[in-house]
């Protein structure tokens, strides 16, 4: 399946750049210490909230939007001060190879790595005690990720696909609804998880 270049630019690279633009002006405030009031019995103590990195985040991304769901959570992990191990889908080998080359070329290899491969490599990664796991994909593998993370009490972010039903009631303009549903189900061709189920 060949994704149109314009869609990749808009729906993947563009959204990653939007995320970075959102993070950049806020990063100093997010990283700053914030004073917190203390209970009067603890006076004259002073309290602070300090953001700290979790450590190493594992990002497991899908084949349908590999750039978006690899680099957007990577930008978030970096903004939080974390290292990243990225596992792109084996079903998008060319894109995964380009991402691996870019990260090896421009990022510190002590802090950022890409592991390519299939289910066997993913299983080996899930045996490791990561500090956070971000997974985008189906519910079946999501439950495997969750079970593996539970062994180490690793926090998990799951962005799971599924059915996207469409409800059209009697007040809807049927011509408009039909066009929108047809567009959503046939663009790219219907690969994103948020497209209506046809």
Q: What is the predicted function of each stretch?
A:
Residues 1-48:
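N-terminal Rossmann-like NAD(P)+-binding subdomain of aldehyde/semialdehyde dehydrogenases
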Residues 20, 81, 112, 133, ...:
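Residue-level signal for inorganic ion chemistry
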Residues 38-106, 110, 153, 175:
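Conserved small-residue-rich beta-alpha loop and adjacent elements
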């Amino acid at each position: 399946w060949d994704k149109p270049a314009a869609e990749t630019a808009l729906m993947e690279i563009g959204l990653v750049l939007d995320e970075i633009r959102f993070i950049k002006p806020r990063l100093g405030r997010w990283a700053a210490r914030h004073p917190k009031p203390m209970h009067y019995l603890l006076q004259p103590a002073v309290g602070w909230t300090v953001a700290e990195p979790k450590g190493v985040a594992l990002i497991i991304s899908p084949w349908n939007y590999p750039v978006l769901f690899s680099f957007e959570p990577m930008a978030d992990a970096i903004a939080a001060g974390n290292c990243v191990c990225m596992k792109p889908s084996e079903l998008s080998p060319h894109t995964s190879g380009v991402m691996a080359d870019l990260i090896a070329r421009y990022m510190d290899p002590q802090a950022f790595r890409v592991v390519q491969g299939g289910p066997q490599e993913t299983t080996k990664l899930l045996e490791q005690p990561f500090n956070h796991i971000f997974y985008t994909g189906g519910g079946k593998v999501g439950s495997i990720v969750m079970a593996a993370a539970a062994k180490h009490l690793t926090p998990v972010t799951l962005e799971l696909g599924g059915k996207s039903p469409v409800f059209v009631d009697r007040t809807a303009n049927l011509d408009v609804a039909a066009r929108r549903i047809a567009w959503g189900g046939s663009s790219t061709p219907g690969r994103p998880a948020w497209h209506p189920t046809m």
